[in-house]
Amino acid sequence: MSCAPRSRPQEANHALRPLNVVLITIDTLRPDHLHCYGDSNIETPALDALAARGVLFESAVAQTPLTPPSHASIFTGQYPTVHHVRNTGGFVLPSSAKPLARILQDQGWDTAAFVSSAVLKKAIGFNNGFTVYDDQMPRQGNKRDFGEDAERKGGDTVDRALEWLNTQSGKPYFLWVHLYDPHMPYNPPGAFKDKYKSAPYDGEIAYTDGQVGRLLDAVSKKAPAGKNVVAVLSDHGESLSEHGEYTHGVFLYDATLRIAFMMAGPGIPSGLRVKQQVRSIDFLPTLLALLGGRAPGAIQGLNLVPAFSGQAVPTEISYEETVYPKLAMGWAELRGIRTNRWKYIRAPKPELYDLTQDPRETVNVLKQHPAEVGKLEAQLSNISGGGASESVETNTLDERQMTELKSLGYLSGFSPQHYDLNGQGSDPKDKIAILKLLYDAENSQTHLPEARRIAILEQALRQDPSNPSLYHQTGSELEKTGRYDDALRLYRSALAHGIENGRLHSRIADLSLRKGNKEEAISEYEKAAKLNPLDLESAVNLGTAYLEEGKVPEAERVFKWILSADSDNAAANNGLGLVAIQKKDPDAARNYFDRAVQLDPDLVEAQMNLGLLYEMSGDRARARHYFEEFLAKASPAQYGSIIPKVKQELATLQ
């Protein structure tokens, strides 16, 4: 087995064939739960039809079982060690990257993306090259949920994509639609819930297939098949209790790394099934080859088009990693190499599996094959950079954002977190009991009382007191039950255990603010922002706290920073409107409030602020309109003290 080079320089593209490109990525989709991959217990007619008119890769694998880094590999053709997106949260695709959307946009394509989860929000750099990047998640009551758990149903995402598609004419387009429904919790809608009552994960997949069908029907009506290249990939799979893991992210077994991968369009034979191992990094060079071009820059992926005519493509080696156990759990990270025959996993207790004899990876044969282990370890070291240790830091800001942050005078001390990926820490295999407790707490939200869920998490925390995720999840459950003081004590105890991250300081800040301790809240929000400036929800809270303390210049810098990171942030526009009022500039305030309402018609704070502004200017009709909008949408639980005052103001305007 020869050592593969880490990357291959590719020639720049000349003019590409003007074909429409439609990429659908389906989150958490195991290929062995699709009919076209052999599962007779599920109906997936849209994906079956796509496979029938194109190529299906029978042995496709992802580079990591995590959504952002896996998508980064799909779009760049690079391993995570090269594109630098290593985990969910805390990492940004560098602005210097040349992802697929940038390549096609530079060649004249219209580009649009519609994503279904906040883990792919534009602030982490995936909007590079997209003219439209729709990452708006649904509201939770009167608060838009920007947390990593925020998602929207595939039908809503496809609706938005179809609206955009209907505006396209003339130019070729690149449309990316990301569907998140197979991700836990599994709660398929309507008839799918009834039909797949005993297999809700399959129900989510069947529902998603229907949304794929809706989208592809519209694509085919917009232009004939000869004008469209369509690709479907899953970003990773789902363990479904195999190997003691219930979801994904912790281990590197095929349950979470085998993916669905199919393509159809000009230059792709119908009904072809490719058996050799291929990788998610191979998508980019393959697509560009179909368009008559080459992938630019240093990539690790290979063009699979020769495989369509039976030629071998040297995709024998696939690098795999998950740093999630280290960054989220405080355990050891895992790295591995997969070939057509072998799976080698570097861990505190390393593993080797013969996939031809043991495809479910149940018998570790490491001791029986020392020579193979040596070869695979050499391959792994070659790809991952040599030594057994690597120092990484969360790169929540790229160079453009750092420049913007400095120009605004915001956050003089950005403090990225450093991690040593040295294989040290508990082997995740030894923490299966913790994973079981976590799953029991997460998966029983409609079955167990809140107190029981908290007890389960506290049991896990006693067994693993240095696990950051356990503090976050236990604290969240305590907050849901109104045990705010207990949650605050828990978060502070996490700091005492040496755990520090932006999310932890943000939660301490929110709870301090609830107790009326504004000074501590501001201090904690500032710490959170220094660790992760792209936690925009915390940044909004920091700006609001500054305003309430009369620190108008500081508030203005924060809100402007937010808009530099996300120009469509409604809350930041509302905040700058409040700043403009403090600066006695009602015209600017009105513009900001109008923009906030335009971006988010349900942002009731902006509705109320417009009402007050129009009342002050003597425009009684508009003041009434916005006060009525506020009263129609404001939650009594959140705005109980304000609603009577707005009603009183409205009465004076009748």
Model regions and ranges:
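TPR/TPR-like alpha-solenoid helical repeat scaffolds
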Residues: 612, 638-654
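A hydrophobic alpha-helix/topogenic segment detector
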Residues: 540-541, 574-576, 608-610, 615, ...
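Structural signature of tandem alpha-helical TPR/SEL1-like repeats
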Residues: 445-456, 480-493, 500-503, 514-527, ...
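Structural marker of alpha-solenoid helical repeat scaffolds
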Residues: 463, 497-498, 531, 565, ...
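Catalytic domains that recognize anionic headgroups
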Residues: 2-510, 514, 523, 534, ...
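Generic detector of contiguous secondary-structure segments
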Residues: 392-405, 600-621
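Short helix/strand-capping connector loops at secondary-structure junctions
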Residues: 1, 355-359, 624-634
